Amino acid sequence: MKIRTEDELQDVIDSEIAWRKKELSAVKANINTAKNTALRAGITLLYAHWEGAIKNLAYYYLVYVSSLKIPYNRLKPNFLAITLKNDIRHFDETQKVTFQTEIVNKLLCRYNQGSNIPTENIISANSNLNSTIFTEIMSAIGLPTDEYEK
């Protein structure tokens, strides 16, 4: 998927939200006729849409930011962390200073370069979008969660 402009990002977001609204409206209309069953189904469907929308919208945003190729020094640190995720994981596992130095050099060199942010397998709700996972997803794309917290 390629999302290169704000208009393309807005179009894909609008499309994502529109079909979800349509489906939820249909369930809401059914609730009046078959209250208990439809209400239980509606709650399950609402949760599924909430989880799916958050994952997909975060992914679309990540694809968009990735396509801009903005230097890492102009992005929030989370984008460099995503890029160096595997290297960072190996940093702690190895006892070799040469390998650790190589990782640090990679980090320092990339800081001023145009970004090459991976987008696949970054956003996941682990089939359970709770507040902790929501915060992780928002952090992955560099957005604050303050206004969602009590």
Regions found by a protein language model. Give the residues of each.
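Helix-loop junctions and short alpha-helical segments
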Residues: L46, A58-K150
